[in-house]
From Swiss-Prot:
Species, as recorded: Rhizopus delemar (strain RA 99-880 / ATCC MYA-4621 / FGSC 9543 / NRRL 43880) (Mucormycosis agent)
Isomerase recorded as keyword: yes
Enzyme class: isomerase
UniProt name for this protein: Peptidyl-prolyl cis-trans isomerase-like 1
GO biological process annotation, one example: protein folding
Cellular component aspect of the GO annotation: catalytic step 2 spliceosome
Species classification: Eukaryota, Fungi, Fungi incertae sedis, Mucoromycota, Mucoromycotina
Gene that encodes it: cyp3
Pfam families documented for this protein: Pro_isomerase
GO MF annotation terms: peptidyl-prolyl cis-trans isomerase activity
Length: 165
């Protein structure tokens, strides 16, 4: 795996290492990678968690309605039929319908085949799945909002981390 393929999300519960699928969703990977590099995700909370489904973050407003991409407000889907939501640890773009990708993303906690063809899959958790699973157990209210805020403390690109060492 190339260093440029990985982003590390250091969260309030621990580190989540993300392998990006550059060959399958290059624009989506570039968006996520660049937003992480620019510090866009630093201090941003996971604003929605649904047990046995997914954890969602990437909205700096924390409302689930905010966030923009590096390409402007929204950009097109990169749906690859060879990639499916087959289990826990799949990284996909959250959206409000076709071609409405911004900065929000989610990580699955279980198979979610009904999302196939509707959300761009652009990576997977390569390390830190225990953190994702623990986060999936956090208590939420009736609107799937967390009682105890869980944040991305900072997001790092593996190549940048290696430069610092």
């Amino acid at each position: 795996m190339s260093e440029r393929e990985e982003v590390i999300l250091d969260t309030s519960m621990g580190s989540i290492h993300i392998e990006l699928y550059w060959d399958h969703a290059p624009r989506t990977c570039k968006n996520f990678y660049e937003l992480a590099k620019r510090g866009y995700y630093d201090g941003v909370s996971f604003h929605r968690i649904i047990a046995d489904f997914m954890i969602q973050g990437g909205d700096p407003t924390g409302t689930g309605r905010g966030g923009t991409s590096i390409y402007g407000e929204r950009f097109a889907d990169e749906i690859n039929p060879g990639l499916q939501h087959t289990g826990a640890g799949i990284l996909s773009m959250a959206n409000a319908g076709p071609n409405t990708n911004g900065s929000q993303f989610f990580i699955t906690l279980a198979p979610t085949p009904w999302l196939d063809g509707k959300h761009t899959i652009f990576g997977r958790v390569s390390d830190g799945m225990n953190v994702v699973k623990r986060m999936g157990l956090v208590k939420t209210d009736a609107n799937d909002r967390l009682f105890i805020v869980q944040k991305i403390l900072y997001a790092l690109n593996a190549v940048d981390l290696n430069k610092e060492l």
